[in-house]
Design a protein with these regions (language model features):
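Central regulatory/effector-binding core of bacterial HTH transcription factors
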Residues: 1-39
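C-terminal regulatory
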Residues: 17-21, 33-151
C-alpha cells in the first residue's frame, strides 16, 4: 500500500537511465542482466513470440517458414535509436528478415491493437501478448526455423 506522503512519478520510456543520477529509484527493463552494481530481480520470461489474429491468418495464410514471412505484413517496434528488425535462423545462421512493414510504432500496445485489428504479424515479448493469446484474440505462430529480434 502507498503511504499518503509518498510521491509516484512514472516515466515510460525505452531509454536507458542511470539509477540515482537521473533521479530514478526504480526501473523495470527487458533484456540482459544489468551491471553487477544494480540489484535485479527477474519478473517474467522475455521470450519473443510471433503472433497474429485468427482473421488475419484466415485471410493471408499461416506462415510456416522464414520465406513464408516475406509474403506477410509486419507490425514493427521502433526502439529509442533504431527500428527493431526481425531475424530468422537458418542453416547459415541468423539473418535479417525483410518482412514489409504495415505499421511501425514505439508503443507495444499500439502494435498489439493493430494485430488484433488483423493488420499483420507482431513479434513481441510473450508477457505482453499473453492476455490476447489467452482470450483467443491472437494466435502464437511456430515456424520451422527460430525467429527473434535484433537488439
Amino acid at each position: 500500500m502507498l503511504r499518503a506522503t509518498a510521491r509516484v512519478d512514472i516515466s515510460s520510456s525505452d531509454g536507458l537511465v542511470e539509477l540515482g543520477r537521473d533521479q530514478i529509484d526504480l526501473a523495470i527493463r527487458g533484456g540482459r542482466q544489468p551491471q553487477d552494481r544494480v540489484v535485479a530481480r527477474r519478473l517474467d520470461d522475455n521470450r519473443f513470440l510471433l503472433a497474429a489474429s485468427p482473421q488475419y491468418l484466415a485471410q493471408h495464410g499461416r506462415p510456416r517458414t522464414l520465406a513464408d514471412l516475406l509474403q506477410h505484413k509486419a507490425l514493427l517496434y521502433r526502439g529509442p535509436h533504431a527500428l527493431i528488425r526481425w531475424q530468422g535462423r537458418d542453416e547459415e545462421g541468423w539473418r535479417e528478415l525483410a518482412v514489409p512493414p504495415a505499421f511501425i510504432s514505439n508503443d507495444g500496445a499500439s502494435l498489439i491493437a493493430m494485430a488484433c485489428q488483423h493488420r499483420g504479424l507482431v513479434l513481441l515479448p510473450e508477457w505482453g501478448l499473453r492476455p490476447y493469446l489467452q482470450r483467443g484474440e491472437l494466435e502464437a505462430l511456430e515456424l520451422e526455423q527460430p525467429v527473434s529480434v535484433n537488439r
